Amino acid sequence: RALYVSLHHSAPALAQAAAERALGHKSLFFCQSRSLTELVAQRMSGLHTEVFVHHSSVSTEERHAAEERFHRGQNVCIVCTSTLELGIDVGDLDQVFQANAPSSVSSFLQRMGRTGRRAGQTANTTFFCETADAVLQAISIIELAREKWVESVPQKTRCWPVMVHQLLALTLQFGAISAERCWSQLHRVPDFSGIREAEFLALVAHLKAQDFLFESGGLLSMGQKAERVFGRKNFLELYAVFTSPQLYRVETAGGQTVGSLEQGFVDRLVEEMSSFLLGGRAWKVDKISHSDRVLHVSAAPRGQKPSWGGFVPQLLSFPLCQRMRRVLAEETVYPYLDDASQRALADRRADLGPLLARGGLAIQLDDTAARLWTFAGGCINHTLKYALEWTTGWRVIADNLQLRIEGDGVQHQRVEAALGTIAALGFWDDSGTQRALLARLPEYRLSKFQQALPEAMALEMVGEYLLDIEGARGWLTAAAARSI
């Protein structure tokens, strides 16, 4: 394997370095967001490599054209999101680039696996990082892959939004169907094996009360609200489980569809003044037609990167974050780092290494807050966050590596005591605890069918994505043992 991790402190510098490395080769450049994809592609354009963009908001025609021209080219780079991680054949490939780091070992292996397929060629990935934390994440992913560790696929047994989808699909298939027949067909599916019949019937009752389902003569059919929400274009929304936000088609004067933008971004655009990036090119807004949701555009010399909504935090796994902790605590030299990455790693080790080496809780204090370095991953940290906020009244900000705790009297001993409270026997098993945590969850939109669920089931779905109660309990037990 040929691996290289480099550090560049801005997206333009990152794009410049990638363009130099791409020269004369066929490369795929993976980015973690559509916005960064557009910015990097625009910065790479004009630097002697033919650059294309590939993500879900670029039109199908543009994506197919990029794939075809990439097949034929020799000095080409497609800047893309995970749309090119699997399945799509773009032919022989020389290099894979990664902006910052992917969120999982499996993604890294899939992306690197696009190279090294020709005789005599070596599989390779070059990481172009913007921050020291991205360097740390890239190292940890590489080292876990070297150890032949990869994430397991968790089995879900209470998939409420899919249950709603299947219920509506059955009414569409049969016209009218009894709840008993629906249950007999669905309860055998592994994704629903954790749902009891009484819970299923409660869901059906809610869907009837909200007019998503209509019952007559003991048979269920689609309610008027379901037809309004999901019935457009011959129930197209029921044939696609994934959510699509309200989109505006971006079209040139010649009728070419460039791609699509979300309404939230379009609402901030001004005719004859605003410009934006899409498909790696800059476009000026000529006219916005709200009635048919079309944005009429012409070429522009420059533009701003678009924003796409639906923010949901990128949650890293516990094993990956623990590997990041180990990288900081050890003195291992990684030969695939450039000089800037080596210096950034040395700085992070100097900052956190002594704290981690002491054992016990890794807490840093400043004038206004305490930082608890858990390296426990996003789900465990968010679980700890909501438990601490509920029991102490403090404000807690969680990411994958740490909790920032703000409030009156936040000191080392009080943080230890608060953790002792939520580590107490029976705390996590108490139904009041679980209700309190679920009540604090943000209203993340994870599925188009979420709106049809009762509140408790919708909160459970968000909680399953964001929380890990067993993991939090395990981390607290281990932390208590280290503090003895």
Residue ranges and their predicted role:
Residues A2-L3, E147, C159, K233, ...:
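Terminal, basic amphipathic appendages of nucleotide-handling enzymes
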Residues W149-E271, S275-A282, K287-I288, Q364-F375, ...:
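C-terminal accessory/connector segments of nucleic-acid motor ATPases
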Residues Q342-V410:
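C-terminal accessory regions
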Residues S6, R249-T252, S298:
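Short, acidic/hydrophobic/Gly-rich beta-strand patch recurrent on exposed beta strands
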Residues A13-R21, F70-T81, E197-F200, H206, ...:
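Phosphate-interacting basic helix/loop segments used at nucleotide- and nucleic-acid interfaces
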Residues H55-S56, V153-T157, L220-S221, R293-S298, W394-V415, D429-Q434:
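A generic structural motif
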Residues R1-F174, S178-K225:
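Helicase motor core with emphasis on the C-terminal RecA-like subdomain
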